[in-house]
């Protein structure tokens, strides 16, 4: 069967299912494709097809993820679903599947469970901005009061992790009934109601080109008669010739003006998100800049040395450490294009961190790096990746 090309005439949003094991994340994903297939918005994918997720490697970490796409009348969605809990942890920390919003699946029969809590915490730490709740398996509850209790419990848990628990849409239903073609309230209509909530509650994300300009510096050259050129791939925003930028990180911040932009040796009047460019900068010598810094819109990003992060430590099988690490651990932190050494502070009651663990740490770098919340990084020892992390909060 030939793959249909989705026309990009609708806004695109990335979402995913999160929640405790066996609460019905994959069944819900299958049900969404089945119900939307009726209006031609999806190709139905049975549970087994989604559950047998292919393994991918993201920054040396093995992650199993299923990617499903579908559309509502308003939007085109890319949806990720992971078979195992560890896959979710890795996925969310590495940002392998960036989510603009998530559908939290909670079984009405069990209520919130440990992984429900952990996924909400991770969503908060890694910056999943919006959550919609699908209260699954409501056919297993006869008592409406019990359902209300579970709903209250879920709202309280969301509030605990600073999500607006009172405002978040909670849609009750049964993914299984929807898959069986049930047309009562908890069957197919519940799936359509869920998609309506996702459509309206999760905003369309800002496009990369609309964000403030940022380009990680990969290399710096001196071109005789022209001046100094910094090369790299524009991460976000647009840079026009004649605009002022700041050079941030590793050294005191400097201001300069981009006097030329070139791509494939052709001169352009601007560079935008996704372009590999050379930016000619005024008044700076080759030795004034280095790999690991960023060119950015003035005032949009600042250099920092202390931050809190959520990290996943690679297992031995993934090529990570074979032994635990302890407080005072000093690896390198690879941000964008360069390694910076830093020391690790563990949470109060934690003595050591084992390969395969996922943990919140505090880091102090020896030199400042341009950073902001949600920035991803790798933890390395002599060039070998031993972990992946995301900045959860900047300390100073």
From Swiss-Prot:
It catalyses: GTP + H2O = GDP + phosphate + H(+). Gene3D superfamilies: P-loop containing nucleotide triphosphate hydrolases, Translation factors. InterPro entries: EF-Tu_GTP-bd, EF-Tu_GTPase, EFTu-like_2, EFTU_2, G_TR_CS, P-loop_NTPase, Small_GTP-bd, T_Tr_GTP-bd_dom. GO terms for cellular component: cytosol. Mg(2+) binds at residue 26. It is found in: Cytoplasm. Residues 10-206 form the tr-type G domain. Pfam families: GTP_EFTU, GTP_EFTU_D2, GTP_EFTU_D3. Residues 19-26 are annotated as: G1. Residues 60-64 are annotated as: G2. Residues 136-139 are annotated as: G4. SUPFAM superfamilies: EF-Tu/eEF-1alpha/eIF2-gamma C-terminal domain, P-loop containing nucleoside triphosphate hydrolases, Translation proteins. GTP binds at residues 19-26, 81-85, 136-139. Belongs to the TRAFAC class translation factor GTPase superfamily. Classic translation factor GTPase family. EF-Tu/EF-1A subfamily. GTP hydrolase that promotes the GTP-dependent binding of aminoacyl-tRNA to the A-site of ribosomes during protein biosynthesis. This is Elongation factor Tu 2.
């Amino acid at each position: 069967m030939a793959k249909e090309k989705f026309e990009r005439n609708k806004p695109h949003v990335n979402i995913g299912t999160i929640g405790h094991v066996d609460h019905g994340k994959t069944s819900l994903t299958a049900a969404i494709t089945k119900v939307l297939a009726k209006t031609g918005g999806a190709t139905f994918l049975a549970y087994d097809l989604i559950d047998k997720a292919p393994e991918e490697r993201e920054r040396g970490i093995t992650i199993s993820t299923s990617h499903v796409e579908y559309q509502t009348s308003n939007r085109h969605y890319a949806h990720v679903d992971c078979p195992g809990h560890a896959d979710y942890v890795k996925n969310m920390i590495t940002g392998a599947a960036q989510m603009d919003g998530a559908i939290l699946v909670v079984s009405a029969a069990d209520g919130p469970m440990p992984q429900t809590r952990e996924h909400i915490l991770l969503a908060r730490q890694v910056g999943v901005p919006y959550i919609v709740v699908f209260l699954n398996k409501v056919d297993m509850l006869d008592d409406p009061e019990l359902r209300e209790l579970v709903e209250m419990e879920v709202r309280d848990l969301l509030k605990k992790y600073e999500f607006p628990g009172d405002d978040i849409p909670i849609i009750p239903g049964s993914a299984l009934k929807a898959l069986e073609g049930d047309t009562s309230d908890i069957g197919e209509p519940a799936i359509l109601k869920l998609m309506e909530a996702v459509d309206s509650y999760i905003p369309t994300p800002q496009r990369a080109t609309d964000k403030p300009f940022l380009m990680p510096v990969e290399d710096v050259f001196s071109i005789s008669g022209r001046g100094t050129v910094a090369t790299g791939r524009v991460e976000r925003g647009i840079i026009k010739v004649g605009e002022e930028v700041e050079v941030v990180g590793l050294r005191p911040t400097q201001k300069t003006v981009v006097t030329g932009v070139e791509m494939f040796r052709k001169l352009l009047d601007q560079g935008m998100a996704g372009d590999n460019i050379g930016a000619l900068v005024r008044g700076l010598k080759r030795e004034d800049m280095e790999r690991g810094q960023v060119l950015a819109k003035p005032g949009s990003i600042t250099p920092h040395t202390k931050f809190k992060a959520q990290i996943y430590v690679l297992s031995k099988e993934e090529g990570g450490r074979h032994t635990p690490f302890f407080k005072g651990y000093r690896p390198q932190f690879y941000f964008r294009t360069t390694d910076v050494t830093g020391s690790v502070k563990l949470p109060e009651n934690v003595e050591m961190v084992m390969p395969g663990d996922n943990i919140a740490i505090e880091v102090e770098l020896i030199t400042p790096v341009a950073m902001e919340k949600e920035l991803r990084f790798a933890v390395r020892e002599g060039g070998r990746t031993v972990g992946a992390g995301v900045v959860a909060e900047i300390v100073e």
